[in-house]
Regions:
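Short hydrophobic/Thr-rich beta-strand motif most characteristic of the beta2 strand and flanking loop
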Residues: 25-34, 40
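The feature encodes the CheY-like receiver
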Residues: 14, 56, 80, 84
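Short amphipathic alpha-helix used as the core "switch/output" element in two-component signaling
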Residues: 39, 54, 61-72, 90
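Acidic catalytic/metal-coordinating carboxylates
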Residues: 32-33, 59-62
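Two-component/phosphorelay signaling modules centered on CheY-like receiver
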Residues: 2, 11-29
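Active-site residues of response regulator receiver
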Residues: 8, 52, 80
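Active-site beta3 strand of CheY-like receiver
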Residues: 44-50, 55
């Protein structure tokens, strides 16, 4: 069905999102920081990346540029505990597919992943 990489330093969030996304039939990979996230991206080539904004070794907003440079056809969705309009705008400028707040948008995660997956799948098929 597709591959999703989750980059988040909160173990509970990683576990919860992995379970929810995995139950939808996606193959899920996890990373707790930017460095491991980049390694997972290169090794597993996911169509969609969910990335926390605040990571122990960097900013998810800045990481979007690196992820898109390495895998331009993969779609990145940023997650944050606190909605921040300037971060959201910068994330989109850096190439993010979307930017959502954790908790408030739990019911939006799966439809958003499905839309991002569809866009990435079409892009990969036209490559």
């Amino acid at each position: 069905m597709g591959k999703v990489l989750i980059i988040d330093d909160e173990k509970q969030i990683l576990s919860l999102l992995s379970r929810i996304i995995g139950l939808e039939g996606y193959e899920v990979f996890q990373a707790a920081n930017c460095k491991v996230g980049i390694k997972q991206l290169e090794q597993n080539d996911p169509e969609v990346v969910l990335c926390d904004v605040c990571l122990p070794d960097g900013s998810g907003v800045e990481l979007v540029s690196e992820l898109k440079r390495l895998r331009p056809l993969s779609e990145v969705i940023l997650l944050t505990a606190h909605g921040n309009i300037p971060d959201g705008v910068q994330a989109i400028k850096n190439g993010a597919f979307d930017y959502i707040t954790k908790g408030d948008d739990n019911n939006k995660i799966l439809p958003l992943i499905a839309k991002a997956m569809e866009k990435a799948t079409v892009a990969y098929s036209q490559q």
